[in-house]
């Protein structure tokens, strides 16, 4: 095996869906254009999801939670070199790195992992080993700063847009007679989909809005509730639930959409630290 330059220690990775998964995959692919990269996710990654690039290797750890970090430590000790850089998807993954490792550790910050006050001591313990903390936004940086107990850790902001395709050929949009709305996200409470449905239902009853189509793409715990709500609000004709979509289907939805809808808000200990999908929509010129 060629000399390992970067090890990415992560809890999650595609085919699991979400912004963090996309960010970790994009980071791994981009870095593997220049360095040998090994990705260590917690779960199985099917062969079709693995890169054909020989510089990018994925080693999975589909084990009970209490064993994952133990076996990741053993593996890291086996492959690490003096100049290997370690990148963690969050402070939680620092605990999967052997304690005697002196290599540089970069930790990514996404937002909601800094909301639980019960974890402040654990967060500070993990980040005491980090060289750099990279937040996805100034908002996330301030969240992390509030729990860092005056730490002098180098802390910077880099928006996670580095993996996005720049091809202008994908930006050609179709023209619609009927307005086409799009929501593309993990379907949970804080995405504001329920409130949007209720608002559209009121506008429809008051005849302040005519025909429209709303595609809701994604999966998650609120999907069944939203399907029931669309019937209760008499929106079953207008709303199309697409379920999980692959990149090809996602691009098709973006191309034919006029408005992107996702009024996300803080719910309990869950927030939108950055919201990469807003940038994807903007890339297609969708307000």
Regions found by a protein language model. Give the residues of each.
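Conserved donor-binding/catalytic core segment of Leloir-type glycosyltransferases
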Residues: 7-9, 134, 173-191, 197-202, ...
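N-terminal strand-loop element at the rim of the active site
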Residues: 10-17, 22-67, 145, 154
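A short, histidine- and acid-enriched strand-loop-helix "catalytic/donor-clamping" loop
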Residues: 16, 93-95, 105-121, 131-132
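Short His-centered aromatic/hydrophobic patch
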Residues: 87-93
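Short alpha-helical donor nucleotide-sugar binding micro-motif in glycosyltransferases
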Residues: 127, 244-245, 252-257
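Donor nucleotide-sugar binding/catalytic pocket of nucleotide-sugar-dependent glycosyltransferases
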Residues: 128-168, 241
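Nucleotide-activated donor-binding/catalytic signature segment of Leloir-type glycosyltransferases, i.e.
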Residues: 215, 224-248
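Acidic donor-binding loop of glycosyltransferase active sites
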Residues: 255-270, 286
């Amino acid at each position: 095996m060629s000399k390992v330059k970067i090890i990415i220690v992560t809890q999650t990775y595609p085919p699991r869906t979400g912004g963090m998964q996309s960010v970790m995959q994009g980071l791994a692919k981009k870095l593997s254009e220049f360095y040998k990269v090994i990705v260590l996710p917690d779960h199985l990654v099917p062969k079709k999801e693995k890169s054909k690039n020989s510089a990018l290797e994925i080693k999975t750890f589909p084990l009970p939670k209490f064993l994952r970090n133990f076996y990741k430590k053993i593996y890291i000790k086996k492959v690490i070199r003096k100049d290997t850089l370690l990148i963690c998807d969050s402070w939680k993954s620092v605990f999967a790195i052997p304690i005697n490792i002196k290599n540089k550790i970069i930790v990514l910050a996404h937002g909601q992992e800094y909301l639980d006050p019960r974890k402040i001591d654990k967060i500070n313990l993990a980040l005491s080993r980090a060289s750099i903390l990279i937040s996805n936004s100034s908002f996330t940086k301030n969240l992390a700063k509030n729990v860092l107990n005056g730490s002098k850790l180098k802390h910077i902001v880099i928006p996670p847009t580095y993996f996005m395709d720049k091809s202008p050929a994908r930006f050609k949009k179709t023209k619609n007679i009927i307005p086409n709305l799009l929501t593309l996200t993990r379907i949970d409470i804080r995405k504001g989909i329920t409130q949007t449905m209720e608002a559209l239902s009121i506008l429809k009853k008051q005849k302040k809005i005519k025909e429209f189509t709303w595609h809701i793409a994604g999966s998650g715990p609120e999907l069944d509730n939203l399907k029931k709500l669309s019937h209760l609000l008499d929106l079953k004709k207008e709303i199309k639930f697409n379920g999980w979509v692959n990149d090809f289907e996602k691009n098709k939805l973006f191309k034919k959409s006029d408005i992107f809808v996702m009024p996300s808000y803080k719910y309990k200990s869950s927030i939108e630290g950055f919201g990469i999908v807003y940038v994807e929509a903007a890339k297609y010129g969708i307000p």
